[in-house]
Swiss-Prot record:
Matching InterPro entries: ALMT
One GO cellular component, as annotated: membrane
Family of the protein in this entry: Belongs to the aromatic acid exporter (TC 2.A.85) family.
Swiss-Prot/TrEMBL keywords: Ion channel, Ion transport, Membrane, Transmembrane, Transmembrane helix, Transport
Organism: Arabidopsis thaliana (Mouse-ear cress)
Main location: membrane
Topology in the lipid bilayer: Multi-pass membrane protein
Database matches in PANTHER family: ALUMINUM-ACTIVATED MALATE TRANSPORTER 10
GO biological process, one term: malate transport
Localization, UniProt: Membrane
Record function comment: Malate transporter.
Lineage: Eukaryota, Viridiplantae, Streptophyta, Embryophyta, Tracheophyta
Membrane spanning stretches: 48-68, 78-98
Protein's name in the database: Putative aluminum-activated malate transporter 11
């Protein structure tokens, strides 16, 4: 079974022809991930180390959040505070482009906005849906954190 799908010449409206192009299957994309990670690690090992730190800390905080018996008396906004502290502390170890104060202001504003909307979302969606929505929010927050670390 071939991993590559070839598409032949396609005639366009103006008579121009598109040359063959290749569509990669997901297995090919997955095979390229280690090579990309290796090249990023060779260029700047701090980025890889920082990514592992962020991923590990957000995973631990997420696991603590799913053990709701620890947080019944505190409330759901406490977890957002913990995640903010984790993100802000890790900001000091990988500073590129923006200054630390600009990054902290941007990340705190985004997390504060989400914390303010949290009780309304919980009432609307219920506890089960809230737990399911927490993971994509964490991923989006990690991506936002990564974007904030990009130089201009």
């Amino acid at each position: 079974m071939s991993n590559k799908v070839h598409v032949g010449n396609i005639e366009m409206e103006e008579g121009l022809s598109k040359t063959k192009w290749m569509v990669l299957e997901p297995s090919e994309k997955i095979k390229k991930i280690p090579k990309r990670l290796w090249s990023v690690g060779k260029e700047d090992p701090r980025r890889v180390i920082h990514a592992f730190k962020v991923g590990h800390s957000l995973t631990l905080v997420s696991l603590l959040y799913f053990m709701e018996n620890l947080f019944k008396g505190i409330g759901s906004n406490a977890i957002w505070a913990v995640m903010t502290v984790v993100a802000v502390l890790l900001e000091f170890f990988a500073v590129e482009g923006l200054t630390i104060s600009e990054k902290v202001i941007l990340s705190m504003a985004a997390r504060g906005r989400e914390s303010a909307a949290e009780p309304h979302e919980r009432n609307e969606a219920g506890n089960v849906c809230h737990s399911i929505k927490f993971l994509p929010k964490s991923i989006a927050r990690a991506k936002q954190h990564h974007v904030l670390n990009q130089p201009y």
